Every structure is written in C-alpha cells, then in structure tokens.
Amino acid sequence: MSQKRDNCIILLVDPPEADKISQEFKTAFGPERATHVNSDLLSAAYKLAKGFSESILLLSYLKTQRHPDLTWLDPEDPGFLEVKNPASEDRIQDAFRLAFFTGAKKAVLVRHLSPELKSEWVSLAFEAVSDKTAAIGANQDGSFYLLGLTQQNLKILETPGFFHGKSAESLAERAKKNKLTVFSTPETYALTSEETLLKWMESKETLPPLFPHPREAAQHETKKGHKHHTHRQEAQVQPPPEKPPL
C-alpha cells in the first residue's frame, strides 16, 4: 500500500453539460453530440485511471447544481478535489500540489482527449519520473496527453501558458531550461475532429453506436428526443464502445 501511495494519477473531470465543453469541441461535433463524445472519453480515461493498481487517483472536478457529484461517471460516487478556479492551468497546479501534500512522491496527469492512452505508458512514466526527469506524452497535434512530475519539478508550471497550443513542446522546453531530462512516452493523437473520432472507432474491433455520423444522428434525433441525454447522465463506467454499423 505504501508504494501505491507514492504514486498519484491526476484526471481533470468536467460535468456532462454543453457549457462546460470547450468551444473547439462543440464546433467540431455540435453542442449536444460534443457532450456525449466528451463523456465517453472521460469514462474511458476514468476506467483506465481507476484500474491502475499502482497508484492512488485524484479527480479534479468542476461540480455544478445539475451534477454536484460524480455518480454520473461512477455509481460508487468517488471523492474528488472540488475546483475553486475553473482555469485549466490553475486546476492542474492545484491538483499536483494536493497530490504531493497528501504524500505522493510522483504524480502523473493524464488527459481524456487521447483515447489510445495505455496503462503501460502510465507505468513507464512513473518509472521514469524523478527529481531530475519529467515525463511528457505528446499528441500528433503537439498538445500533451500526459505529464509526470515530482514536487521538486512543479516549477515548470509556474509561468502561465503551458496548457494550450503545442503544449508538449512548451513543457519539454521548460523542463530542459530547468536542467531536467525529458522522458517521452509514445506519441498518440487527441480526439478533436470527425477524422480522429473515426480513427478511434476503427481501432476497435467491436464498438457500440455511441458516436453516430451527423446524418444518422439527425435521422434518429426526432425519434429519441432527450432520451439519450437522460441515459448519459445515469450512465455507469462502460468498457470501450463497440463499432457502430456503417
């Protein structure tokens, strides 16, 4: 148990509400569909993080009146760090600080928008992280999907501007300026478009029809109304979805 508490996985979680989804994501998929896609990505990331037996899990959650807890994500209602400042960079710094305050020696932040993240990569990050080494996982678009640090290395997050754009490159440059070695986990992709959504779907042998093509969604919208939204709020953590019929 002591070794498990030495490691902490951090995951930022937002409620399944359209106004809590990034504008870029809503532009790519439409407000309602973006909410469903984002929730499925969060469920997959949460399942991976919760199932990682070699660490404790810290969830940074921006609760709302409609979703004051995480029962929509997990019926066991896991505890969470309540977000005071919704700005992503502040949330990340607060989560890392709490992880170390509660006794963790290493903390690894994972981002849910990279659906091909593997637990093996998280293990590699924990093994590599030290006071002299930061672990960074990059997406093909230059953003980061994983960041592993010790308390000694939190200084690379002190200056604003590390979350957006080509953030993996920015973090790596900051680490090197602080005389840290950068350990890179395998490159993957962030799901931000129809193309990457299909890429994720096609990477699975069996996927359920959770992500219908916009035309299919339009055809079924009048029949289903708000039924899908209600199910999403009550959804339990599910295994990776099966591929929908073309």
Question: Where are each of the predicted segments found?
Answer:
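A short, N-terminal amphipathic alpha-helix
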Residues: 37-54
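N-terminal nucleotide-binding beta1-loop-alpha1 segment
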Residues: 1-25
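Conserved donor-nucleotide/metal-binding helix-loop-beta segment in metal-dependent transferases, i.e.
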Residues: 116-141
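Short, glycine-/small-residue-rich phosphate/pyrophosphate-handling segment
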Residues: 153-172
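Short aromatic-hydrophobic micro-motifs that form the base-stacking/packing surface
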Residues: 108-110
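Short phosphate-binding loop-to-helix
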Residues: 69-106, 195
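Short beta-strand/loop segment that forms part of the nucleotide-sugar
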Residues: 54-63
